[in-house]
Design a protein with these regions (language model features):
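Short glycine/serine/threonine-rich phosphate/pyrophosphate-binding segments
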Residues: 39-45, 67-69, 89-91, 209-210
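Conserved catalytic network of the ASCE P-loop NTPase/AAA+ motor domain
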Residues: 72-75, 98-100, 134-137
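Conserved acidic residues
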Residues: 78-79, 104
Length: 261
């Protein structure tokens, strides 16, 4: 009924991505986290690492970041971290949300067929991601997942510097010496084949190792040093309903995970 009233009265209206861009992003340095999986956790971690380093970033994402107790925050710093979704912007605007977000630094961690309700096939999704990459300015940065052939191929579309991350041997940002225990994951991050920082992460699984790598590459581009990255990751509390530990029952640890972590 509200929508019909707006249309009947010819009132001005805009999609949420348009409002975010026009009200917040023109004067910000936009950090866009995109890909089929891992967006929410990575965006939350990027915002937390920047906060730990004293940057006071803004954040908009699709889950509740435990460190902030919310899915959004408006900081006083110039950095704006935003989860970049390829889903359409509104019923009247079928372009992908992330095309509105003015990316200065963008991560594309992986790329698979998704959102079958609006995309006919993988080619249609590829097109939106190619458009995103082409929006990054020449002085910006694209960070792609080396373990995803589809994401890695996007480097050829970029007109800006490109870095890669993953467990693959050729990744610019690579995790090695990975060990997993009951309390989390430990590993060494190498940058261009050289030791960069040792990580103790409360997060579990290879996907979360990749999320940490992506976040590390992003905040390193903002000038955050290795010590703050290590301490920030160690104090990261994760995202609600993303591989969230609910406790133990009869010796079995229970986790809640809503969707892509």
């Amino acid at each position: 009924m509200e929508l019909e009233a707006v249309l009947d009265q010819k009132m001005a209206y805009a999609s949420l991505p348009e409002v975010v861009r026009n009200q917040f992003l023109w004067d910000s340095r936009s950090f866009v986290v995109a890909g089929t999986h891992g967006k929410t956790t990575t965006a939350a971690l990027v915002a937390w690492l920047l906060t730990y380093a004293g940057r006071d970033p803004s954040l908009l994402m699709g889950g509740v970041a435990k460190n902030f107790g919310a899915s959004h925050r408006l900081g006083r710093g110039r950095e704006f971290v935003i989860e970049g979704d390829e889903y359409d912007s509104a019923f009247f605007d079928k372009t992908a949300k992330f095309l509105k977000y003015l990316p200065d630094v963008a991560v594309v961690g992986n790329l698979e067929f998704d959102h079958a309700d609006i995309f006919d096939d993988l080619d249609a999704i590829r097109l939106e991601f190619r458009r995103l990459v082409r929006l990054i300015p020449g002085q910006g940065l694209l960070i792609v997942g080396a373990d995803s052939d589809e994401a890695f191929a996007l480097r050829d579309e970029a007109h800006c510097p490109v870095e890669s991350f993953g467990l693959s041997s050729g990744a610019d940002w690579k995790a090695v010496s990975i060990t997993t225990g009951e309390t989390g994951t430990k590993f060494l991050i190498e940058r261009d084949g050289e030791p960069f920082v040792r990580i103790t992460s409360p997060l579990l699984g290879d996907y979360n190792v990749r999320n940490v790598l992506a976040a590390t590459a992003m905040v390193a581009a903002a000038g955050v040093d290795a010590k703050d990255i290590a301490n920030g990751v160690a104090t990261f509390e994760g995202v609600k309903r993303r591989l969230e530990s609910l406790g133990e029952l009869h010796g079995v640890t229970l986790y809640l995970s809503l969707i892509h972590i």
